[in-house]
Amino acid sequence: MLQKNDLIVITGAGGFIGGNLVKYFYDRGLLNIRAVDKKPLDEWYLRSPATMNLQLDCTTEEACARACDGAREVYNLAADMGGMGFIERFRVECLRGILINTHMIEAAYRAGVERYFFSSTACVYSTLLQQEANVRGLKETDVYPAMAERGYGWEKLISEMFCQEYWAERGLKTFIARFHNVYGPYGTWDGGREKAPAAICRKVIEAVDTNSRTIEVWGDGHQTRSFMYIKDCLKGIDMIMHCDRLIATPINLGSSQLFSVDELIDNVERIAGVKLDRKYNPSAPRGVTGRNSDNTFIKETLGWEPNTSLEVGLRATYHWIKDQYLCRKRGECVAA
């Protein structure tokens, strides 16, 4: 059990999930947090002046050693990634993420860290199982025989193996969560790295602001995904990290409710109070046809399931992005 003064290290803390995770622990009275990201501090989405905020590039051994020094728990959420447009166009950048986990897990082991969390992804699953929109939920065992998403998916799958072998050979307690489309406030919403929920919110906001009646939709609108709100994700991370039955055992962390891209747009339009025309772009990056999470294992093991509906989560996300959009329009400095 963590004590108030135990040092927690969170990498990727200048980003979406990492920044929200820092706030999650801080709000629960765990104040000894070392927050790490390679971005300049003024570009972090969330930043607490009461935590140790370090700008470090965790693709290097030296930075990882400095980050892990004295830590009891390490949450490795650092990654060079984005939405499907980024993942498909910049596979080399995504693959370089393996340097982060390689150096972080070794640094954690050398520093005597008790628990190490690795943020994996549903992109590790075989693309051959994701060729239909009405897809069945993916079980943890479906990852083999392997045919992961090119670049990003393979990097994460290999890093999962590192976590499993550090437990088997060196006794480091590692925990692996396969995230399924996390969304919410304080995340990237433009610039090419944003994911579908944020991108659609922004497109609708722009259309309303410019009196346009049309938004571009990547793909045909029929591709499907499940979407997990950030608050549900944070609770799941905490539960996974502190369950010894899950040491070195990958587990899905996501919603099992499937939505098409068109249904996602329908939800955002209702929140905005508009109805827009859709210009479909089948040649744009679209990823697999369908992907969903089978949550049988996490329900049986932890009793966890998401409790935030897509409508509620999207409403909070939409209004946060709208505020950011309007602030930027006024020339104010905002997260991006």
Predicted feature locations:
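SDR active-site strand-loop-helix element
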Residues: 11, 36, 74-80, 116-122, ...
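Active-site YXXXK catalytic motif of short-chain dehydrogenase/reductase
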Residues: 97, 152, 156
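NAD(P)-dependent short-chain dehydrogenase/reductase
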Residues: 130-137, 151, 161-241, 256-258, ...
